[in-house]
Amino acid sequence: MKKSIFLWMGAVMLMLSSCSTNESITDSLSLSKVSHSECNYHASRTRTDDDNPYKSKLKLTYNEADQTITGEYINYMLSCDYTDAGINIEQDADGTLVLNPWNEAENLVDCICNINIYFTIRNATMQNYHLVLNRRTVTIVDQDGSEHQETWTDYEGYISFKNQNIITIDL
């Protein structure tokens, strides 16, 4: 009887140890309260990023009591003819938090503008995150006709709310 109890307890412990903490965190993160401001700072597309006096920033505020991160993507640049904009959240298998802004636009005008995107991440139970902002993968065709993929990001790094509850990242 004791042997079967120990075998049963061993099987349960093995099952519990095979489930990683990241899996439960991955399933629980969610996005809410996504909105955006109106267009500001209109400029011609022919101007360079250096001409834009309003640089993009990501501001994140951690609320431990509510287990939320309130975010603001400041000065997200897009076409003036956009019809909607927002941000998506993903979490990779390794726990990396990925925030990807998006917009719907026809891009038929010679005009760009900046908006602010506001969002809340719910069930943010950890104080440390590997954060990737605006990850996109493109296929590049080389001169010889071969193709390869490259992944670009606006930001990739580690953030910690352990000693501060507000983090601002210059992009």
Regions found by a protein language model. Give the residues of each.
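Positively charged n-region of N-terminal signal peptides that target proteins for export
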Residues: 1-4
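C-terminal motif of bacterial Sec signal peptides marking the signal peptidase cleavage site
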Residues: 15-18
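Sec-dependent N-terminal signal peptides
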Residues: 6-11
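Exposed, flexible binding/inhibitory loops of compact, secreted disulfide-stabilized domains
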Residues: 20-171
